[in-house]
Amino acid sequence: MSCCGGNCGCGSGCQCGSGCGGCKMYPEMAEEVTTTQTVIMGVAPSKGHAEGLEAGAAAGAGAENGCKCGDNCTCNPCNCGK
């Protein structure tokens, strides 16, 4: 079985394809799967504060922290499933 379906995962910040961050993204959960539900109740900040974060995340979707995903995965360390 290839790592994350053959997606490239570089460092802690790169997430390529299907939102996967690479091999052993959560090593402590490799053997068991648990489900947790969290309910947060409170007051959220106005939309204006979050818009900058969303725009920044969209801009770095293809290459993040020097990671180029796909056939030419270039980063250190690079974890590409074959």
UniProtKB/Swiss-Prot annotation:
Extract the GO molecular function terms from the UniProt entry: metal ion binding
Task: Give UniProt keywords alphabetically.
Answer: Metal-binding, Metal-thiolate cluster, Stress response
A Pfam family for this UniProt protein? Metallothio_2
Induction, as annotated: By sucrose starvation, heat shock and abscisic acid (ABA). Not induced by heavy metals.
Expression by tissue: Expressed in stems, leaves, rachis, inflorescences and seeds.
Q: What does this protein do?
A: Metallothioneins have a high content of cysteine residues that bind various heavy metals.
- Family from the record: Belongs to the metallothionein superfamily. Type 15 family.
Name under which the protein is recorded: Metallothionein-like protein 2A
- The species this protein belongs to is Oryza sativa subsp. japonica
* Originating gene: MT2A
